[in-house]
Amino acid sequence: MELTEPLPSAAVQKEEQELLDRTFFSWAEFSRFFDKWCQQRLVVFSVKSSTRVARSPWANTPPLYRLIHVLKYSYVLLVCKDVRMPNKSTAWPPQPSCPAFITVKLSPLRDRLVVTECQLTHSHPACPREFAYHFRPGHLLANSCLPVRITNQISKQFVAPADVRRLLTHCKGPDHGVLDALQVLEGLFRTDPEAKVKLVFVEDQAMVETVFLLTSRTRALLRRFPRILLVDRLPGLQGTLDLMAVLCVDSAGRARQAACCVARPGTPSLLRFMLVSLLQSAPDVKGRVRCLTAGPEVAGQLRAVRQLLPCARVQICRAQGLETLFSKAQELGGASQEDPDLWPLLCRLADSKSYTAYSEALAELRSQAPTAFIRYFEHNWAPRHDMWVRFRAYEATRDLDACALVRSHRRRLLRRLSPSHSVAQCLRDLVAMQWADATGEAALRGC
């Protein structure tokens, strides 16, 4: 007796209509959505066939060449994996496979993924027990590169050269740039076995979220010059990455890169992660840091930062603080063509060289700026004036300008970074930059 395909119910037809033409701007976005979608319906799908974006004829043309590691596939056919265990004692012939399927394709504009076809009528009932046994969150991402059990196990830990080699042996392909990033780290460990690297993967996904990097050379610099640390953060670098660097100030007053961190945009508590990793790599500097200068985001992490660096004064970089203040003033209607003097006034406030000068500038600000901005300023900035006004700066008596040092480092960094969107290329550029600095220092010593 031949089984017939069941007719779709009204509920199934509605589900199909909701799923059709749904768009996703990355394979990771689709995978996260699809995990939840399957969990709600107790169904397991697997990839029957696929074509990678890198193999398409348009892979080297804009905008696709910038999205190869983001979109991953130009075509994917997902079929229902009927996980019911067959009854070996039955004499009936095997049932045909479940007809449910979903097709995802690259959009005509080649900038997103679209569900182009779906048939959601199953030939079997949902089975919670079998679903719980067979379903693995993140399997669409894991199938492309690394098993998520491995990435979950090693995530948030320092990795040794042997760990990187082990991860490489498990890699099934270059998806998500994981293979490329691991190869960069393998090359780093080959030349610097004492380097410190911490990897963080997105939970239940074979996708690198954060990489902390410190070479043996920069660790030596940090241990030699731990007194003043500067934090330079470049959010949204190349549109796809956040980059953070910790700089130490040497005896000649130069900012030297001690450690760096590459992360997915919007990674929470990145500064805390950076400092924790730094102190784990060089625990002897904890009580020797006297000043830490960072961006305005440090204000929201003060308690954690002061616990990590109990002997350090915490400051906000004045240049970055001014940018934040002016941006907020624009948002609240206090910086426009009608009020062109606000920026100079904020600059005078931040650059005050005495408490008297600060009080005078503050009184002027209160009389000129809109009420909404003043309320914001009084709540968030006035109580912390000792963190961002010049006359309270730690380095003021040492003839140093922390903001200028950070700006100089940023210019040098941007000159050396490639116009790439991948974690691997950013790591490659950072490693090359550090070795170039080391070579230059060696040449100077030889002169």
Swiss-Prot record:
SS bonds (residue pairs): none
GO biological process assignments: hematopoietic progenitor cell differentiation
Protein name per Swiss-Prot or TrEMBL: Uncharacterized protein ZSWIM9
Encoding gene, per UniProt annotation: Zswim9
